[in-house]
Amino acid sequence: SLVFSPEIDELSKPNKIVSLYDPCCGTGGMLTVGKNWIKENISKDVEVNMFGQELNPQTYSICKSDFLITNEQPENIKLGSTLSKDGYQDTNRKFDYMICNPPYGVSWKKDEKYVKNESKEPDGRFSVGIPRTSDGQLLFLQHMISKMEPSGSRIGCLLYTSDAADDWSS
């Protein structure tokens, strides 16, 4: 709700169409929850087009199947590593809203060559810096920033930090 609440007036406009993107969508659960929250709490008339990308072939298949069953647009879900092969790069697609829960502590070593090369490009997704290869959460955040509409977008990203596991969080 933090992503959408400040936009209630904008989302309540007649014939409103918005895009919702998750770069590590898994089975599509966060996308579905986001769309349902907008429909139930803001306006059932908003058209929410969902987009996502998933690395794991099994969870990708579940997401595509769910989209088929629920009459969504399964072609909007891409297979592959968001970090090394942006599924929306060819169209330079931007999104109104982006949500994700990137994998914590997952190595991006397989994508290292591509990520490092792109980090050297002034307009590259990762040009502000790259984290250690043992945890790529911040790469997903940088990726989403690159997908923002020129007029602005809203991002909700659940990042895990080691502080969350320390005594401070008790």
Over which residues does each language-model region extend?
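Short, conserved SAM-binding segment of the class I
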Residues: H143
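A short acidic, Gly/Pro-enriched loop at the edge of an enzyme's catalytic core
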Residues: Y88-Y97
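Class I S-adenosyl-L-methionine
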Residues: S1-I42, V48, Q53, T59, ...
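Generic beta-strand/beta-sheet core signal
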Residues: P23, Q53, K78-G80, C100-S107, ...
